[in-house]
Amino acid sequence: MLYGLRGWIGKLLPRGPFFCNLCGYNGSIWLWRGHDNQAIRKYQIIGAGRRKCDCFACGSSDRDRLVFEFLRKEIPNFSVLRFLHVAPERQLNKKLISLGANMVNIDARKSGYKFAYGSETITADLTCLPFESETFDWVIANHVLEHIVDEKKALYEINRVLKPHGKAILMIPYSPNLSVNIEGEINWNKRQRNALLGQQDHVRLYGKAFLNLWSETFEIVRLAEVNASRDLNLFNGEKIILVEK
C-alpha cells in the first residue's frame, strides 16, 4: 500500500538524474539506506555504508537494481529457468516473477511468510537445503553468507543444488583493502561485531581472499562489471559476484 502510493506520487514529481529499472521511477527523490561506522570507513567496505540510494516509488536498493541489470543482460528468456532466491529482496523477486522466472524463495526465519504479491517463502537453512541435487539454474543469495558461521557448508549446498554449469549471484560486503577475511569470535558481542566487522549481526568481514577460497567449491568465481545504459544510482565500485558450477 505504501509503495503503491509512493509510485503514484512519483509520477507527479520532477524527473531526476537516476532511473529505477525495477519500477520505472525517474524522479528526483531517493531515500536513505544503511548505516555508517568506523569499520566501514576504515576498510572502505563495498556494499555497506550510509547512502541515498533507495527508490522512492518501490523501495528497491542499489544492489537490487545492480543485480537485475546484470540478469536482464545475461538471460534472454527467464521463463525456462528455475531460480532459488535466498532471503528474497521483494522488488527484485517481484520483477523476476513478472518476467516468467520460476522462483523458489527461502528464508531462515522461524516461520514462513508471504510477500505482498503472494509469493510463498519456505523456511530453510542454507547449510542444509531441502532440495534434490541439480535442481536450479540460478541461485541468488545477496548479503547472506556474512551471517552464516559454516560458510563452507552453505557454499557446498549452493553448488549441490545448482544444475551443471548453473550460476549463482552471491553478493557480500567486502573490503578491497583486506587480503584475508576477518573471522569474528563466537564470544564477541554486538558492539564488538559492529566495531570490528561493520555490522552487529555479521560473523565475518570478507577480504579479497574470498575469490580464491570460493574457487575450492565452484568452477568459476569472478567479479562481473555491469555497464548500465542509464544511471541507476548504484554503489560506486560494486560489481556482481558471480560463481558457476
State each model region's role:
Residues M1-C128, A228-E244:
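Conserved N-terminal segment of class I S-adenosyl-L-methionine
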Residues V86, V139-I140:
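Hydrophobic beta-strand segment of the Class I
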Residues N93, V149, L178:
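Glycine/Thr-rich phosphate-binding loops of Rossmann-like dinucleotide-binding domains
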Residues L126-V139:
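A short acidic, Gly/Pro-enriched loop at the edge of an enzyme's catalytic core
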Residues P130-E132, V149, G207:
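GHKL-family ATP-binding catalytic core of two-component histidine kinases
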Residues H143-H147:
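Short catalytic micro-motifs in class I SAM-dependent methyltransferases
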